Amino acid sequence: CDFMEGGITPEDAVWAAKRLESAGLDLLDISGGFGGYTNPGHMEPGYFSPLSQAVKQAVNIPVLLTGGVQTGTDAECLLEDGKADLIGVGRALLKNSAWAKEAITAVQTM
């Protein structure tokens, strides 16, 4: 879903994901914002999670979710809720080089 009026819908994304899987793709990365469009008003951890969850339910290959994940706890909760198989972290890691170490500690104390 590209969040543009008249753009790609979640149903379109699921259709494409199934075709990509059939073509031999090994992993799907659900992300966005790099083309200039974001999901207005939705900045919660894993803000593309409705889309990643729909795709995950439709395919048998791993689905990676990127977007809005700031902490290890955010990542773990998204995984536990079945939103994705893997979590991508971008800006949070760029802001804090110790992010991975802190994420491990946070998840171990959950």
Residue locations for each model-derived region?
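Flavin-dependent oxidoreductase catalytic cores
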Residues: 1-110
